[in-house]
């Protein structure tokens, strides 16, 4: 885990208040399903980073889907950033899911993943790795 400055590749509004953010990955570290990214905003009044779950990772790009929580919020500020903007992130954060353990507990090879709301995006990356 390290703090780094990265470039936004895209930050698209995909549904009411929901955004799909993709950033460059400039580290040799591998992001695992279940880990997250701390995003530091440019506004010095917002000191705490915004933790956003990783939705996908291909070794060169990190993809996150997040909800803007309303006017004046940190995620509202983040939703205004666009392609080419630079942001500071700390990533990957957290332990991630125990993929091999999950595979070992599969009954008949089937695994059911459950999530709700903004908890669904991290399931996408987990499903790809299972």
Which role does the model predict for each range below?
Residues 73-130:
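FNR/FR-type flavoprotein reductase catalytic core
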Residues 2-83:
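Ferredoxin-reductase
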């Amino acid at each position: 885990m390290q703090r780094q400055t990265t470039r936004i590749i895209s930050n698209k509004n995909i549904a009411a208040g929901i955004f799909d953010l993709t950033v460059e990955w400039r580290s040799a570290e591998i992001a695992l399903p279940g880990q997250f990214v701390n995003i530091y905003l440019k506004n010095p009044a917002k000191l705490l980073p915004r933790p956003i779950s990783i939705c996908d990772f291909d070794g060169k790009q990190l993809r996150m889907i997040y909800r803007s929580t309303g006017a004046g919020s940190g995620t509202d500020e983040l939703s205004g950033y666009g392609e080419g903007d630079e942001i500071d992130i700390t990533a990957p954060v957290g332990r991630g899911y125990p993929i091999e353990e999950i595979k070992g507990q599969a009954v008949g090879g089937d695994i059911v993943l459950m999530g709700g709301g903004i908890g669904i995006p991290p399931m996408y990356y987990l499903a790809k790795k299972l």
